[in-house]
């Protein structure tokens, strides 16, 4: 299920020419277009070193139906690995050049880290079973192009590196060129992120068999609650994975969050491993 990258770029680049709702602004606490990563990055704050959220930031206590001990068999604690783990995601972005191709554009970088921590495994010194490091460099446009009741908010094109930072035989990594499109319609948000794998994938040559060539994300705001779903799927092989989430505000800055992941590819070490994981915890920022 490959696609023409050049054709996709040719389709997307003209979008930046449409009238823009989000442009470079000097703000203090005024919210950007809700749900728009690019509109948020275009806002200038008093502190020039302000970091912005990219993906969601959360901390969960989780339990999985099955643990991939075979993939970590070279770890001296593998046989004692537990099914309950603390899972957290840290995801931040920083604008490098606002207005690089007009007031609605930004050149930016992001860093996302996901970890699976055997916190309760005190007999083995509470090791981190897996951590994935995902830096990106991207060009983003905030738009207000409307079609069929939907408003295209974000157009983003960039380079993504994803690695677990391990050496052989547990090393996993891949590099991708990607495009991210996000549109809103009332309380609905839909985001699609197709990618094209570049470079070597010797540590995981069949990763697209399980992870496919895109990620689809859907969000719905129900009162103060946010319902979310995202996943990736390879239509040729029938493999994929999906994540469901619900968050609700506890305080102004913290949300209660519960998450279920089922399928392949929850982490890089588990890209070809099928499991179901349930987690409960807190979140700092959701889709909206």
What are these regions (language model features)?
Residues 1-42, 288:
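Cleavable N-terminal export/targeting peptides
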Residues 22-73, 129-131:
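A subset of solvent-exposed loop/turn segments in beta-rich extracellular surface proteins, enriched
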Residues 65-75, 82, 97-220, 231, ...:
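Outer-membrane pore/translocation modules
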Residues 85, 89-91, 134-136, 178, ...:
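Membrane-embedded beta-strand positions in outer-membrane beta-barrel channels/transporters
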Residues 274-288:
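Outer-membrane beta-barrel "beta-signal"
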Residues 92, 258:
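Conserved, mostly hydrophobic/aromatic
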Residues 20-24, 163, 198-200, 228, ...:
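Intrinsically disordered, low-complexity linker/tail regions enriched in polar/charged residues
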Residues 224-254:
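Glycine/small-residue-rich hydrophobic helix-like segments
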């Amino acid at each position: 299920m490959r696609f023409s990258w050049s054709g996709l770029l040719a389709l997307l680049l003209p979008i930046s020419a449409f009238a823009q709702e989000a442009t470079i602004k000097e703000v203090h606490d005024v919210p950007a277009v809700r749900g728009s990563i690019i509109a948020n990055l275009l806002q200038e704050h008093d502190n020039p070193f302000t970091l912005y959220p990219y993906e969601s930031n959360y901390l969960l206590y989780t339990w999985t139906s099955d643990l991939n001990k075979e993939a970590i068999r070279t770890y001296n604690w593998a046989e004692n690995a537990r099914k309950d783990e603390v899972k957290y995601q840290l995801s931040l972005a920083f604008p490098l050049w606002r207005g690089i191709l007009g007031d609605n554009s930004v050149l930016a970088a992001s860093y996302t880290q996901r970890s699976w921590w055997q916190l309760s495994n005190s007999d083995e010194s509470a090791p981190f079973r897996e951590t994935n490091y995902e830096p990106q460099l991207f060009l983003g446009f905030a738009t207000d192009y409307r079609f069929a009741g939907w408003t295209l908010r974000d157009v983003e094109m960039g380079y993504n590196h994803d690695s677990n930072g391990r050496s052989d035989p547990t090393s996993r990594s891949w590099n991708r060129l990607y495009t991210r499109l996000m549109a809103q319609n009332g309380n609905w948000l839909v985001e699609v992120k197709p990618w094209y794998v570049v470079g070597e994938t010797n540590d995981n040559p069949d990763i697209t068999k399980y992870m496919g060539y895109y990620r689809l994300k859907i969000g719905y705001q129900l009162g103060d609650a946010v319902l979310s779903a995202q996943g990736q799927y390879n239509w040729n092989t029938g493999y994929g994975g999906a994540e469901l989430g619900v968050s609700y505000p506890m305080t102004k800055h913290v949300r209660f969050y519960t998450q279920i992941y089922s399928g392949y590819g929850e982490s890089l070490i588990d890209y070809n491993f099928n499991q179901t994981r349930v987690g409960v915890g807190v979140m700092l920022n959701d889709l909206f």
